[in-house]
Amino acid sequence: MKKIMLIASAMSALSLPFSASAIELGDEGVLECGPYAKIGVVGGMVTGVESARLDPADVDCKKHLSLTTMLPFGGTLAAGMTIAPGFRAELGVMYLRNINAEVELGEGKTGSGAANAAIDTGAPIRKRFKLTPPQPTIMPISIADRDLGVDTDILAQAAVGQQQLTVEQRAEDRIAWLKNYAGIDYMVPDSQNPNARVVNPVLLNITQGAPNVNPRPRQNLNILDHDQWRYLVVGVTALSNANKPSVSSVKVLSDKITQIYSDIRQFAKIANIEVPGAPLPNSASVEQIQTKMQELNDVLEELRESFDGYLANAFANQIQLNFQIQQAQQQQQQQQQGQVTAQEAAAAAAVRALNGNEQIIQLYKDLVKLQRHAGIRKAMEKLAAQEEGDDQSQVSCNDKKQQAVAEDSKAGSSKEGKNKEVELDLSMIVAQVKLYADVVATESFSIYIGGGVGVARTYGDIDGKSVKHIGVVASGVLGVAINVADGVCVDIDGGYMHSFSKIEDKYSVNAFIANAGVRYNF
């Protein structure tokens, strides 16, 4: 009989979790089965996100600017079911705001209009136009230039006992004439050793003598020999006139200057520099050509000076084109070829002065560095938007500068020599299905672990541009549940949420999250 009573007691105890009273508390007062609702607050720290902006001081273009993230916060609302003692399933929604990140901009040129305007805010850059210096154009060689080339002399060899000059040193002026007028390099990289330079192969092993003489000797061009040099100049001159451009030299020069002005116009607007828009007339005189070249020199130098000191190792070298046609040379051209041809010769000389000009090439390289700067990119896009009609306010450059300074001052983001600019300003709504399991359970509290997966909708602004993004997230938590009353628990947990996709293909927003909530069991 006692055995029967013990068995009955055991069966009664085993059936207890499935009885109606088990929805409340078990033998130890721990909640076992039943539905519940939970509400709470959440806060955290964003991690895994970095600025998409490159550090302009990094010549390798690999280092990104530092990014300072804010502390997001929000609330949670969930409904769930205790499906078995120590196991819960939950469907919850979490709202997070203040997912902000600031990018730290480098030092600017204090007090310069370019630096102040560069901090102007606006829509992010849409498309970065490529900056490439104008390609060299081989111009026809005039008779006066031919004669000048023929008369180009060489340096005398050093006296006995002194260091002897090389062929390249003695013929330096002739080599320069070949490059400037014909685009021919006397010395070229060695195909066998890229670090070495050799005489251009087209000037070597030239067949000598009459065609009917055999064997025919071969000889390298002797650039020091005046007769050989004269024949070379005449041949190059004839070839340049046979292959001359279909348009006039004045038109070629005008197009080159127009291209340069077009490339620098956006930067000039940021620096509040006016870029001339009138091209050279086809009938431009020699004086007009000289004036146009001086105008180009002044604009480029003013632009360089405006950004001097804004970036490290950039805009340091003064621009001096030094283009000037000597009066005697001009008169000689007019006497030999007439006024129109003299204008063409002057324009051709100006084109040669721009061909491969190291100062202009360096300026373009510096502008490419400047183009990567976050503040400059934003200012350029702001100007582009205004030109397209996106911004009808027609705010002047000075007004934009004042507005930018006022906004920086109000936000407290302006520091001596450095500025912080909001790159991300986002909010997030996350819906997840989660499972929890108790690892330690007592009458008064329990320690649990959990994991979930769901969908996150992120929205807000990135660099002033409105964005919306939906992606998959997963999370894991570790927490403690405290029984504060019958059917009421306080859950405190911390965890990590991972995003499987990037916003705008640039930003992966992950977060460490702490949550505190009240769970009420029905």
Curated annotation (Swiss-Prot):
InterPro entries: OMP/PagP_b-brl (IPR011250), TSA (IPR004933)
Keywords: Cell membrane, Membrane, Signal, Transmembrane, Transmembrane helix, Virulence
Keyword set includes Transmembrane: yes
Name listed for the protein in its UniProt record: 56 kDa type-specific antigen
Pfam family, one: TSA
Organism from which the protein derives: Orientia tsutsugamushi
Compartments where located: Cell membrane
Disordered as annotated region, ranges: 385-417
Biased composition (Basic and acidic residues): 398-417
NCBIfam families documented for this protein: Orientia_TSA56
Principal place of residence: membrane
